[in-house]
Amino acid sequence: MFDFGFSELVVIGVVMLIVVGPERLPKVARTAGHLLGRLQRYVSDVKSDIQREMQLEELKKLQQQVQQQAQALESSVRTEVAQVESSVDQVVAAIKADAAPPDNTTSAESQAAADPAAVDSSQQLELRLDTTPKQVVGSDKA
């Protein structure tokens, strides 16, 4: 705290002995020691308070930085998610467009894709084929 050498302390002690006297010198020295101790404790308390405030200020700055970085990360994630959603929507639309029948197909082709039995009946109608067997009347061979 103070930069005193041994010779300077001896000079101060001799001056105090002359001014205060030998009877009261121990009492004054004890009181000075107590006051010096209080002063040192007060200075250390002030230092610790200042350090605490500085740490709180640093923590607040650090918290703000973390919050800003978190917000930046959140916004970048949101933009990436929006881009992925739009690309997924485009793929879904393309798949739906490929799955839908084209406009230039005939009704028979669309029926063929839907039901093979319907194709047979439509072809039979077009060819006018009869699927039921005819019985010949009068030719009984029994």
From Swiss-Prot:
It is a single-pass membrane protein. GO terms for molecular function: protein transmembrane transporter activity. Its main location: membrane. Disulfide bonds: none annotated. Pfam families: TatA_B_E. One of its GO terms (biological process) is protein transport by the Tat complex. Residues 99-142 are annotated as: Disordered. Part of the twin-arginine translocation (Tat) system that transports large folded proteins containing a characteristic twin-arginine motif in their signal peptide across membranes. Together with TatC, TatB is part of a receptor directly interacting with Tat signal peptides. TatB may form an oligomeric binding site that transiently accommodates folded Tat precursor proteins before their translocation. Belongs to the TatB family. The Tat system comprises two distinct complexes: a TatABC complex, containing multiple copies of TatA, TatB and TatC subunits, and a separate TatA complex, containing only TatA subunits. Substrates initially bind to the TatABC complex, which probably triggers association of the separate TatA complex to form the active translocon. This is Sec-independent protein translocase protein TatB.
